[in-house]
Amino acid sequence: MSPLAILISILLSLFCLVVGYYVRKIIAEAKISGARNAAEQILGDAKRDAEALKKEALLEAKDEIHTLRIEAEQEVRERRNELQKQENRLLQKEENLDRKDESLDKREAMLEKKDHSLNERQQHIEEMESKVDEMIRMQQSELERISSLTRDEAKQIILERVENELSHDIAIMMKESENRAKEEADKKAKNILSLALQRCAADHVAETTVSVVNLPNDEMKGRIIGREGRNIRTLETLTGIDLIIDDTPEAVILSGFDPIRRETARIALDKLVQDGRIHPARIEEMVEKSRREVDDYIREMGEQTTFEVGVHGLHPDLIKILGRLKFRTSYGQNVLKHSMEVAFLTGLMASELGEDVTLAKRAGLLHDIGKAIDHEVEGSHVEIGVELATKYKEHPVVINSIASHHGDQEPTSIIAVLVAAADALSAARPGARSETLENYIRRLEKLEEISESYEGVEKSFAIQAGREVRIMVKPDSINDLEAHRLARDIRKRIEDELDYPGHIKVTVIRETRAVEYAK
């Protein structure tokens, strides 16, 4: 090989080495730059993550600090409230102790004052006793000196003189005590009666002796009468009730004084009208069925009454007799309603006096039981009631209450007296019992006639169902003093000339009016 070829080979080798070196250097620098960039990126990511973790940790720390602060504040408030409560309790106890201390001081002062007063009274009594003893000794000596009496004789004379001097004072004191007792008893009785009346509400009832059966048409009247009057005669014979068929449109009137028979006839006739088959055999069947329905209704009314009043344990026959009072009236007042009212009033008054309320209601409910069958059995309703109560083994207090509520016997218990009082209250209250319209109007007219017969009376008015009369007088003719005299005179004439239940209030009104008109 020639030296030129060798030189070229060497130069090429050197060139290759130089080129390789620079290529490698470039590659190495590129790798180093990439690594540096990667490291910087990793470092940046690490810083960002660290910053995020730092912020998150700060937030969590702040939340925890806030929570701890709230809990601490809550605990502080609770402790402060507890301390405040304890402080209030201590203050209250301190105030209570102060009040007790003041009360004890007052009591101590009061006791000292009473003790001082008692000592003064004791001293005064001792002084009076010594004076009395001295006076007695002086009188004894004087009597012995004057009359030469012995000590025992003088003592007897002194005792008689003292007794005579004090007997009048003792009688006055006893009379005053008796009057006070009567006044207190009257007040207590009025209070009990007023409370009982306020707490008891009752219906006002009216008496009736007729019932009306409505008909679908007037043709039914001919069917009720029947051929030659057979149907109406059969119905009247079976029920004992008069049928009045007149010009009243679509109605038949049943007239009779026995409400049970009248109700039986009404139910029977109503069933016959609804059924349409009206002949003697059908009438007998319906009347018998109606009697059974009325009997069932009477028993139900008795049971309902005992339940409403609160009286239990009555004999079944006595309950049925009690239910018959539903169809019994006295002066227009339904006797069953009256008996219930008396039972309630008696129970209310008994509760005020501390008596047996149940027994009182029982006595009040049964006090008029005799009226249920007094038209069937001989004797007064009181006698019949006593027999029924004895027959069905009622309590002796109940029997005595029945026997004494009209004064036939003496009451032996407070309950018997209460029954009589409740009976009078129920019968005497306004509207409880009725009178005939003619007598009522005549009594009102007589009241006004008596009032207007006096000179100076301008007009009179009978009001409140005749229980009060108001007289308007002329102020120029009658002065205030004459108005009182006029009221007394009219009251006396009413008492002498009229028969009336209860009381009539006489009111004289004298009125003077002065009228002027401003123009």
From Swiss-Prot:
Residues 335-428 form the HD domain. This is Ribonuclease Y. SUPFAM superfamilies: Eukaryotic type KH-domain (KH-domain type I), HD-domain/PDEase-like. Keywords: Cell membrane, Endonuclease, Hydrolase, Membrane, Nuclease, RNA-binding, Transmembrane, Transmembrane helix. It is found in: Cell membrane. It comes from the Bacteria. Its EC number is 3.1.-.-. The chain crosses the membrane at residues 3-23. PROSITE patterns: HD, KH_TYPE_1. GO terms for molecular function: RNA binding; RNA endonuclease activity. The keyword RNA-binding applies. It is a single-pass membrane protein. GO terms for biological process: mRNA catabolic process. One of its GO terms (cellular component) is plasma membrane. The keyword ATP-binding does not apply. Gene3D superfamilies: Hypothetical protein af1432, K Homology domain, type 1. Disulfide bonds: none annotated. Endoribonuclease that initiates mRNA decay.
